[in-house]
């Protein structure tokens, strides 16, 4: 083992000498001096802080606490190219390999990202079409108008189904694969849609929504996970946001189709039927596309893992690909347990007993809960009902404006999330949402809405200028939501180390769907019992408290490596330390990008051992 490690070190240093003439390893020993040429190809750092010396003795380790965490820049009297070496952040011998692919994103990665993001589109289309369908169903189910309670049950059925499957989706993805799980979610969408299209009874419609919810729960968890595992770290945040873009795009298209089919007989059935198109497309594409390299390594299929990496990074040498696969294999073996069940329970234990993991869980679940209990999904599910209530005849047209705003500001978040930072856009978005919700609550008070019994017929004083105020500030609310809390929670995979990531993201996603279930099944009841003013005041209060939570508990993670995230959370939330570190990392990344003229900002990829 010693000879193998030494040989690996010599090979790594020789490769670095070729690519980076002024390379110095992380312990400050051994600089290679050749010509000053640089490349835009692949970058491989082999960190050897604890490498055995000539006498066979290991040097003393220097664990780095959060307060003393440093980023050590290479020192060279002649030239400083801006690259950095991360010191070890744990008490283990650090023999990890750092691999960065400094090149343009390949068409293969773009293809995988967009195909996986179709799940986000289906998720968004589901939340969008039901709003229009609830308005146009009329007496098509059981030959009677749906009550508020029945509307809530139809809507909440999807959230219940998503909650059930999201709990075990992470483990299923480890056992069966990410791609098969997404294809299974397509089958659930297919069955659920067919049941709804042919429904003439309330129970069949609810059953179809429940089964479709199974697919939504799987897709909402696996799609971001799939993208994060195939994306280069230098643009991982932005590629993950593409899933959110597809989600908001699905909502926008659903509202547009709903507006067009609003007065067509059985138009809501056509609206549901259109959801079959992306379902069939994703299933068909995945018949010809591979799974992620990490999954293939987990199953011991190293040949396929190498194949996917080669197609993803077309200009990368075979030696670097081989080294990457070896590190992924070593990481997989570091997860305790010999079978999936044992590994699952060990991961659950580590998630709750390791302080940094538990803080990550608090943040991940907290953000997903905030996303639901600030009321956005209730607006998406029942926007048609809300806008009819305030006097708008073509409520679907107004819903298009709201969902269009959501899409545009999600697109803005796509460009800002890695540059401005996750924490900053959250602390802009949540206060903005709070103000908008407070104004909506006040406007509802002066509008004077009166509910007429327990059915879906609402008596109001008619349209007034307060209705305009409500619409305007719901649009403002949508903009601030999309910019921050609508996007950041789905970056949850970066919070957790690899050995608990599947379980951690399952917990967080399940929290999202549990919140969605509660809101979807109680929103119309809240409107009746505590009035729209009370309902929107509740959402405003949650948004206000959420701002405080994010201010004190959400560190800045933009630009940080996975090891750095765990160090930040090791003995607290360490907001100041995270902001300082993120700022320094961004400066050094910018300097490195300017020096090497890269198309994308390079970010080192640290594979945890």
Swiss-Prot record:
Chain ranges passing through the membrane: 105-125, 153-173, 180-200, 210-230, 241-261, 270-290, 360-380, 397-417, 424-444, 466-486, 507-527, 534-554
Glycosylation site positions: 394
Disordered: annotated segments: 25-83
Amino acid composition bias (Basic and acidic residues), ranges on this chain: 42-58
The organism's place on the tree of life at top rank: Eukaryota
Keyword NAD (UniProt): no
Principal subcellular localisation of the protein: membrane
Name of a matching Pfam family: Sugar_tr
UniProt keyword list: Cell membrane, Glycoprotein, Membrane, Transmembrane, Transmembrane helix, Transport
Parts of the chain on the Extracellular side: 126-152, 201-209, 262-269, 381-396, 445-465, 528-533
Misc remark: Present with 468 molecules/cell in log phase SD medium.
Function text: Minor transporter for myo-inositol.
Protein name according to UniProt: Myo-inositol transporter 2
Organism of this sequence: Saccharomyces cerevisiae (strain ATCC 204508 / S288c) (Baker's yeast)
């Amino acid at each position: 083992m010693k000879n193998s490690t030494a040989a690996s070190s010599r090979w790594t240093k020789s490769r670095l000498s070729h690519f980076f003439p002024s390379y110095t390893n992380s312990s400050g020993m051994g600089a290679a001096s050749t010509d000053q040429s640089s490349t835009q190809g692949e970058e491989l750092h082999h960190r050897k802080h604890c490498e055995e010396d000539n006498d066979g003795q290991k040097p003393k380790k220097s664990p780095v606490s959060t307060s003393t965490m440093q980023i050590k820049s290479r020192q060279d009297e002649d030239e400083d190219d801006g690259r950095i070496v991360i010191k070890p952040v744990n008490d283990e011998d650090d023999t990890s390999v750092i691999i960065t692919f400094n090149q343009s994103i390949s068409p293969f990665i773009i293809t995988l990202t967009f195909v996986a993001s179709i799940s986000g589109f289906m998720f968004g289309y589901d939340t969008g079409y039901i709003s229009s369908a609830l308005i146009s169903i009329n007496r098509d189910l059981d030959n009677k108008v749906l009550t508020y309670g029945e509307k809530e049950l139809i809507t909440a059925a999807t959230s219940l189904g998503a909650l059930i499957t999201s709990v075990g989706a992470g483990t299923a993805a480890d056992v069966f694969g990410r791609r098969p799980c997404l294809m299974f979610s397509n089958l659930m969408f297919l069955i659920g849609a067919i049941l709804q299209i042919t429904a003439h009874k309330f129970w069949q419609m609810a059953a179809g929504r429940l089964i479709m919810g199974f697919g939504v729960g799987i897709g909402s968890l696996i799609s971001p996970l799939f993208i994060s595992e195939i994306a280069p770290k230098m643009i991982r945040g932005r590629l993950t946001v593409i899933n959110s873009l597809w989600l908001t795009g699905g909502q926008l298209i659903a509202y547009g189709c709903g507006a067009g089919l609003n007065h067509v007989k059985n138009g809501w059935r056509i609206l549901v039927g259109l959801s079959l198109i992306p379902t069939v497309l994703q299933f068909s594409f995945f018949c010809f596309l591979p799974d992620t390299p990490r999954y293939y390594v987990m199953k011991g299929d190293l040949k396929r893992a190498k194949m996917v990496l080669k197609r993803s990074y077309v200009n990368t040498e075979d030696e670097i690909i081989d080294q990457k696969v070896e590190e992924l294999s070593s990481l997989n073996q570091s997860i305790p347990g010999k079978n999936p069940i044992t590994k699952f329970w060990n991961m659950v234990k580590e998630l709750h007993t390791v302080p940094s993991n538990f803080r990550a869980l608090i943040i991940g679940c907290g953000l997903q809960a905030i996303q639901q209990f600030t009321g956005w999904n209730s607006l998406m599910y029942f926007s048609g009902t809300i806008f009819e209530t305030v006097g708008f005849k073509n409520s679907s047209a107004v819903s298009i404006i709201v969902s269009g705003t959501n899409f545009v500001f999600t697109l803005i978040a796509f460009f800002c999330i890695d540059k401005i930072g996750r924490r900053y856009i959250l602390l802009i978005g949540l206060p903005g949402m709070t103000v908008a919700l407070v104004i909506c609550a006040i406007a509802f008070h002066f509008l004077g809405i009166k509910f007429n019994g327990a059915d879906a017929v609402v008596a109001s004083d008619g349209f007034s200028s307060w209705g305009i105020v409500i619409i305007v500030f719901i649009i403002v609310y949508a903009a601030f939501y999309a910019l921050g809390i609508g996007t950041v929670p789905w970056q949850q995979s970066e919070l957790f180390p690899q050995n608990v990531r599947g379980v951690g993201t399952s917990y967080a996603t399940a929290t999202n769907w549990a919140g969605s279930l509660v809101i979807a099944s109680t929103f119309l009841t809240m409107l009746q019992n505590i009035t729209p003013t009370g309902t929107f005041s509740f959402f405003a209060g949650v948004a206000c408290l959420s701002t405080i939570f994010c201010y004190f508990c959400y560190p800045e993670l933009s630009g940080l490596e996975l090891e750095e995230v765990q160090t930040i959370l090791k003995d607290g939330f360490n907001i100041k330390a995270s902001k300082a570190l993120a700022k320094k990392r961004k400066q050094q990344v910018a300097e490195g990008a300017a020096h090497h003229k890269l198309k994308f900002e390079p970010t080192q990829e640290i594979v945890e051992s």
